[in-house]
């Protein structure tokens, strides 16, 4: 039975059993745990500076944050790099701008600490260059991580830009804060100490500012979440609120028909809330520029063509699986990373232009209707 329905039934019983019918009874909102329909909009500031303009479904030019808010998006995910000297984006000043834009449109914010000067993912967990001298000194390195997390959040608090959820690392399948080629197996004495330092920084800011920022740990692909959280739990990493998963079917052992299995297992085993914080699907196999797209025909699922309707159906069906399994959110990764004349580390253009929620004329496509369900 739906847990919100149980709360509602208990609330009704509470009213019925009240000794004094004239005495007001305060009832907890049975929908306090809102299902999150999210969008990672980390690229938007850069895309606009590169000349991108966005249009809603009626061909009206509009702020992309407003387009997503009006569609029904209720959570914006923003990445933060430590000191990315190779770009002017995803640093703290850029993140502040993004958070302000999200909050101005009434959307909540998930702040994603990469703890790196560049992309952190299953293949890369590169330590910030400023911390490299302490890479083999877990205590001092943990202090650097703690102070950076604490000071960043304190700075955001002082400008009324605190996020609602914080990720301690991005796709941290491997041990965090490494140099060069990843080392396996995970040194859990080191890894747990560092992760717990980040967690403590968030909890301490909550105490200082009387806030309730929630903490998420993020792993790429559900099958990796199964072993990772088991090892993390055994190593004493237990004080967090959310399990975050990346889910891209082309790289996962679980298809849409079986994704409910690991979701249920993780929720029931660790008694944590769970969200898919990265996913995506192509609406076309055509490329808008010379940058190779991440998704090609290998990304396609039987029954879900590379079309706007196929993309929308994928999102709706994945959301249903997550919800029915006890999960509480889904975030589309970079739905506004449209093609421009600007360059990435690898090419000119976008590697995601066939998987955005905008067509190649930057008009919002059918897939963005996925967010409409949050209004129901």
Q: Model-found features: residue ranges?
A:
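Active-site beta-loop-alpha junctions enriched in small/polar residues
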Residues: 42-44, 81-83, 114-118, 168-173, ...
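Conserved, mostly hydrophobic/aromatic
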Residues: 39, 68, 112, 166, ...
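Aromatic-rich peripheral "rim/lid" segments of glycoside hydrolase catalytic domains that contact
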Residues: 52, 286-317, 321, 325, ...
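Bacterial Sec-dependent N-terminal signal peptides
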Residues: 14-32
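Sec-dependent N-terminal signal peptides
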Residues: 4-14
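Active-site cleft segment of glycoside hydrolase catalytic domains centered on the general acid/base Glu
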Residues: 91-94, 121-234, 238-240, 253-261, ...
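N-terminal substrate-binding region of glycoside hydrolase catalytic domains
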Residues: 29-97, 101-108, 114-145, 244, ...
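Glycoside hydrolase catalytic-domain groove-lining segments
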Residues: 62-66, 204-214, 223-299, 316-327
């Amino acid at each position: 039975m739906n847990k919100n329905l149980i709360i509602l039934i208990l609330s009704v019983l509470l009213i019925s059993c009240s000794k004094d019918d004239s005495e007001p009874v305060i009832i907890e909102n049975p929908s306090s745990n809102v299902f999150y329909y999210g969008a990672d909009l980390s690229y938007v500031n850069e895309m606009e500076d590169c000349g991108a303009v966005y249009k809603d479904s009626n061909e009206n030019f509009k702020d992309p944050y407003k387009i997503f808010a009006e569609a029904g998006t209720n959570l914006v995910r923003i990445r933060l790099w430590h000191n990315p000297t190779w770009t002017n984006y995803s640093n703290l000043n850029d993140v502040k701008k993004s958070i302000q834009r999200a909050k101005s449109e009434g959307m909540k914010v998930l702040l994603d600490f990469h703890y790196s000067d560049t992309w952190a993912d299953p293949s890369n967990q590169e330590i910030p260059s400023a911390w490299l001298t302490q890479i083999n000194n877990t205590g001092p390195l943990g202090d650097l991580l703690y102070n950076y997390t604490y000071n960043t959040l304190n700075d955001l608090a002082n400008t009324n830009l605190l996020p609602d959820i914080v990720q301690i690392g991005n796709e941290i399948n491997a041990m965090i804060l490494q140099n060069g080629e990843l080392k396996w197996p995970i040194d859990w004495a080191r890894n747990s100490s560092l992760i717990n330092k980040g967690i403590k920084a968030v909890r301490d800011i909550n105490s200082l500012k009387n806030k309730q920022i929630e903490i998420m740990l993020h792993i790429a692909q559900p099958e990796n979440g199964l072993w990772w959280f088991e090892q993390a739990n055994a190593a004493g990493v237990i004080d967090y609120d959310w399990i975050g998963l990346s889910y891209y079917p082309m790289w996962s052992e679980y298809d849409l028909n079986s994704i409910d299995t690991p979701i249920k297992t993780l929720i029931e085993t660790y008694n944590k809330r769970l969200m898919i914080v990265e996913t995506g699907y192509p609406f076309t196999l055509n490329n808008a520029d010379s940058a190779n797209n991440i998704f090609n025909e290998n990304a396609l699922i039987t029954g879900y063509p590379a079309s706007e309707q196929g993309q929308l159906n994928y999102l709706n069906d994945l959301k249903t699986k997550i919800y029915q399994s006890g999960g509480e959110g889904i975030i589309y990764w970079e739905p506004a990373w449209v093609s421009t004349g600007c360059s990435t580390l690898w090419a000119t253009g976008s590697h995601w232009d066939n998987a955005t929620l905008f067509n190649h004329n930057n008009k919002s496509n059918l897939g963005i209707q996925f967010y409409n369900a949050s209004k129901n």
